[in-house]
C-alpha cells in the first residue's frame, strides 16, 4: 500500500504557499493532481505545474466566487462523466501579455482569488479555466475540484485553488498512478494525500447533517425505524428506514445491506409504469426485511435523477414525442443524471455503516458512494420489472447509462404483465 502523508501536513504546506499531490479513488479518475492555493500562485509554481502535468491548469472556486465574478458554465449541459463544472475561461485584463505564460497565468489565478476582484477585471475567453466547486466540498463530491477548495479553506485562505493532473514520467501518454506519485512527491518534498483521507478528516471534525427525529414505522414488510435528517447544504429532508441493529454482531457496522433510493413521486407514490422506481423500492424494503438488518435510505431532491418534478414531467413530454430519457434531459439543458450522494454517505456513516452490500443495478452509484470512506464489499442486484411502458426506458438505462440490466432483449410486449427477475 502506498504511503500517504497527513492532511495536517498538506494543509500547512498549502498555507505556506507550497504545492501538494492529491490522489482520488481508483474507481473514479485514479489520478493525482498537483494542487496549490490560487492566491499563492507564482510564476515558479505555475511553471513547475506545467512542467510535470498535462498543462491544462484549472482554478477551482467556491460557488459564491463564481457568482460574484459572473463565471457562467462553459457549456449549458454538463456532459463531463465526472460532473466537473467547467466555467468560461478567463485572463486578467490588466498586468498580462498574451495570458499564456507562467507569469500571466499566475497573475490571473491570484486575481481570481482576490476577494476585491469583480467580473470586469477579466477578459473572456482566456487561458485559465475556473471550475465551480460543489457547496460542501468533498463531503458532497469527492473530486479534485472540491479538494482544492477545501484545502485552501482549511489553510485559512480564500476558497480558490489551482489544479492539474500529473503526467507519468515513464509513459508520457498516460497519467501518473499511485506508486509513481509517491516517488514524485518524495523527489520534490511534496505532501501526498488522498481525497478519501480528506473526507475522513473533515468527517471527524465537521458535520453537515442533523438527525432530527426517529419514529417506529410499521409497513407491509414489517416494522422499520424511520430516522429523519436535514442538511445545511440542501433545502430538502431525507429519511432512512432502518431494520435491526446496524452495528451488527461484532459492533463494527460492517456488511450492512443498504439501498440508497432516489425520490420518485410518480413511481413510488402514483405507481407509474414508466419507470421501475416503485418496484425497486418495494423490492429493497422486502430484501432488507428478510435480512433482518439493513437500511433503505430515501433521498429527497433526487426526483427525475436530480432534475426535479416539473423538469421530469417536461422530459416525459419529450419522451412521448420520441426522445429517450437521456436525450430528453439534454434537450431541456439538463444533465442525464444530476444526483450526488455526499449527503447520503454522511447519513449512512451517522447510522453506523462502515461497509455495505449495496442494492443497485447502477454501477455509477457505487462510485458515487465509494469515495466517502464507505467500503462497498458487494453490489447486490435488484429484480428488473419490465413492462410495455418502461421497456424502452430500461433499455436506454442499460445501453446509454451503463446500468446492469440483463434479459431485457427477451421481453415480449405481446405478452401481458411484467417480465423480469433478479439480475
UniProtKB/Swiss-Prot annotation:
**Entry binding sites for Zn(2+):** 264, 275, 277
Q: In which pathway does it act?
A: Cofactor biosynthesis; riboflavin biosynthesis; 2-hydroxy-3-oxobutyl phosphate from D-ribulose 5-phosphate: step 1/1; Cofactor biosynthesis; riboflavin biosynthesis; 5-amino-6-(D-ribitylamino)uracil from GTP: step 1/4
Pull one GO CC term from this UniProt entry. Answer: cytosol
Q: Which reaction does it catalyse?
A: D-ribulose 5-phosphate = (2S)-2-hydroxy-3-oxobutyl phosphate + formate + H(+); GTP + 4 H2O = 2,5-diamino-6-hydroxy-4-(5-phosphoribosylamino)-pyrimidine + formate + 2 phosphate + 3 H(+)
Family statement: In the N-terminal section; belongs to the DHBP synthase family.
Which metal ions or organic cofactors does this protein require, according to UniProt? Answer: Mg(2+); Mn(2+); Zn(2+)
* Protein name per UniProt: Riboflavin biosynthesis protein RibBA
The scientific name of the source species is Mycolicibacterium gilvum (strain PYR-GCK)
Q: What does this protein do?
A: Catalyzes the conversion of D-ribulose 5-phosphate to formate and 3,4-dihydroxy-2-butanone 4-phosphate.
Q: Which CDD domains match?
A: GTP_cyclohydro2
Residue(s) at site: Essential for DHBP synthase activity: 127, 165
Q: Keywords assigned by UniProt?
A: GTP-binding, Hydrolase, Lyase, Magnesium, Manganese, Metal-binding, Multifunctional enzyme, Nucleotide-binding, Riboflavin biosynthesis, Zinc
Location of region: GTP cyclohydrolase II: 205-423
Q: Would the keyword Manganese be found if you checked this record's keyword annotation?
A: yes
Q: Which residues bind Mg(2+) 1?
A: 29
Amino acid at each position: 500500500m502506498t504511503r500517504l502523508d497527513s492532511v495536517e501536513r498538506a494543509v500547512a504546506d498549502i498555507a505556506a504557499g507550497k504545492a501538494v499531490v492529491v490522489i482520488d479513488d481508483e474507481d473514479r479518475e485514479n489520478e493525482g493532481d498537483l494542487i496549490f492555493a490560487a492566491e499563492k500562485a507564482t510564476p515558479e509554481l505555475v511553471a513547475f505545474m506545467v512542467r510535470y502535468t498535462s498543462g491544462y491548469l484549472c482554478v477551482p472556486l467556491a460557488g459564491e466566487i463564481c457568482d460574484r465574478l459572473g463565471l457562467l458554465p462553459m457549456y449549458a449541459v454538463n456532459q463531463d462523466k465526472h460532473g466537473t463544472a467547467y466555467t468560461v475561461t478567463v485572463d486578467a485584463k490588466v498586468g498580462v501579455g498574451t495570458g499564456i505564460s507562467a507569469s500571466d497565468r499566475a497573475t490571473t489565478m491570484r486575481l481570481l482569488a482576490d476577494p476585491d476582484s469583480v467580473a470586469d477585471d477579466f477578459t473572456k475567453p482566456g487561458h485559465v479555466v475556473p471550475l465551480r466547486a460543489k457547496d460542501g466540498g468533498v463531503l458532497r463530491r469527492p473530486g479534485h475540484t472540491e479538494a482544492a477548495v477545501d484545502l485552501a479553506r482549511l489553510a485559512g485562505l480564500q476558497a480558490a485553488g489551482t489544479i492539474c493532473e500529473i503526467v507519468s514520467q515513464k509513459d508520457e501518454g498516460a497519467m501518473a498512478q499511485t506508486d509513481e506519485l509517491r516517488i514524485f512527491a518524495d523527489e520534490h518534498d511534496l505532501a501526498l494525500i488522498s481525497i478519501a483521507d480528506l473526507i475522513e478528516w473533515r468527517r471527524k471534525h465537521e458535520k453537515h447533517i442533523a438527525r432530527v427525529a426517529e419514529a417506529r414505522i410499521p409497513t407491509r414488510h414489517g416494522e422499520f425505524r424511520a430516522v429523519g435528517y436535514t442538511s445545511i447544504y440542501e433545502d430538502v429532508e431525507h429519511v432512512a428506514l432502518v431494520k435491526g441493529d446496524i452495528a451488527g454482531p461484532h459492533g463494527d457496522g460492517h456488511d450492512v445491506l443498504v439501498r440508497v433510493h432516489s425520490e420518485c413521486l410518480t413511481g413510488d407514490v402514483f405507481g407509474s409504469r414508466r419507470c421501475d422506481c416503485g418496484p425497486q423500492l418495494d423490492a429493497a424494503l422486502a430484501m432488507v426485511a428478510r435480512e433482518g438488518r439493513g437500511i433503505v435510505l430515501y433521498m429527497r431532491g433526487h426526483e427525475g435523477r436530480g432534475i426535479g418534478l416539473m423538469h421530469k414531467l417536461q422530459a416525459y413530454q419529450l419522451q412521448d414525442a420520441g426522445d429517450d430519457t437521456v436525450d430528453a434531459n439534454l434537450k431541456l439543458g439538463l444533465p442525464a443524471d444530476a444526483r450526488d450522494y455526499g449527503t447520503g454517505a454522511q447519513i449512512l456513516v451517522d447510522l453506523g455503516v462502515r461497509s455495505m452490500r449495496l442494492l443497485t443495478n447502477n454501477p455509477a452509484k457505487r462510485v458515487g458512494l465509494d469515495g466517502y470512506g464507505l467500503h462497498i464489499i458487494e453490489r447486490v442486484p435488484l429484480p428488473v420489472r419490465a413492462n410495455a411502458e418502461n421497456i424502452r426506458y430500461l433499455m436506454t438505462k442499460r445501453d446509454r447509462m451503463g446500468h446492469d440490466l440483463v434479459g431485457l432483449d427477451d421481453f415480449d410486449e405481446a405478452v401481458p404483465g411484467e417480465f423480469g427477475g433478479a439480475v
